[in-house]
Amino acid sequence: MHTSRYSACSIATPQRICELAVQRGLDAIVFTEHQVQWLKPELGQLRGANPELRIYSGVEVSLAEGYDVVVICENQSLHFPFAIKFKELLEELSYLRSPYFTFVAHPFRYHSARPSELEMILSQVDGIELNSVNILRGQAHKKKDKFLPLNTRAYLQAQEEYGLIPLFNSDAHADYSVGAIANFVDWSALPKDELQLAK
């Protein structure tokens, strides 16, 4: 989820997202602001104001190759330059002293092609976003009770070929999309922090 606090493309405030998440039955949310991870003190304040919701912070990194990779790791208030090369991102991540989880977000949002740059990314991330509000925008069809991207096959083929963990995300930038699409995970207890979530 993106907030107006850190992502210029969002019109949703952090507190409003938290309120809506609880109203819509979510147990947890992950803020994935563009290029920056929430500062620990600010995230702590938001968590304190919303004890009924588990709040995590990752970062969505826009790459020079034209794709976006989300990083979930121990909160270290990360900041990455816009259009960093994927190889440089991996180098930066190698300096982290803790595990991290990466996934490519909406890789086929504009086309179904798989150029060599995308193949390289797919071969080195842990997961792939198969559906989100922004993937569906202007290119969806309904199959039974689900809305799917028109190019669902491209997403599923990449996920299967590379053995990637499938993710279904709101990718919320506005109130209406909070919880519209969500991951359902069968955990006995929610991870206490980003480090456990990444594992």
Predicted feature descriptions by range:
Residues 36-43, 83-95, 145-149:
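Active-site-adjacent beta->alpha loops and helix N-cap segments on the catalytic face
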Residues 1-10, 52-54, 72, 93-99:
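Mobile, glycine- and charge-enriched loop segments
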Residues 1, 28-34, 56-59, 102-106, ...:
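Active-site neighborhood of phospho(di)ester-bond hydrolases with catalytic His/Asp-centered motifs
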Residues 69-101:
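Binuclear metal-dependent hydrolase catalytic cores centered on His/Asp/Glu-rich metal-binding motifs
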Residues 26, 53, 98, 161-164:
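A short helix->loop->beta-strand "cap" motif at the edges of active sites that frequently abuts
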Residues 15-16, 20-23, 27, 35-65:
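Mid-domain alpha/beta scaffold segments of enzyme catalytic cores
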Residues 94-107, 115-122:
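Internal, conserved structured core segments that host functional sites
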Residues 2, 7, 19, 41-44, ...:
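Charged catalytic cores and adjacent phosphate/nucleic-acid-binding surfaces used
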